[in-house]
Amino acid sequence: MRYPMTPDGRYFVVRGRLWRCTNPTLPPEERTQLTHELMHYRAAIGRALRAQDKAAEKEARAQVHKLKVALGERGAVWWEDGAPDYNRRLAKNTPYATWYAELPVLEED
């Protein structure tokens, strides 16, 4: 399923919440490598949780955060026009509210 993306390409929406997109200026090879590493550490979180290994979980979560910053999904925004960041905010409470309200209703999985 493709999630709706804001007209400016900065966010996608899941269950009414805005999530910052990956920086589109990243070279494809770099984006692929970072995404691969991100998936590895997300899986490591799951393994650590199942093993009840708090230290491994903490390390994996730190790596996920680091990689999401590198991808532009967290940390400083990747756009340069001075617009504020609405990451993780409900779309209805942001300047994207009108756009969001006009989206067709999608069935959630």
Task: Go through the PLM ranges and name each one.
Residues 1-109:
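Extended, charge-rich alpha-helical interface modules
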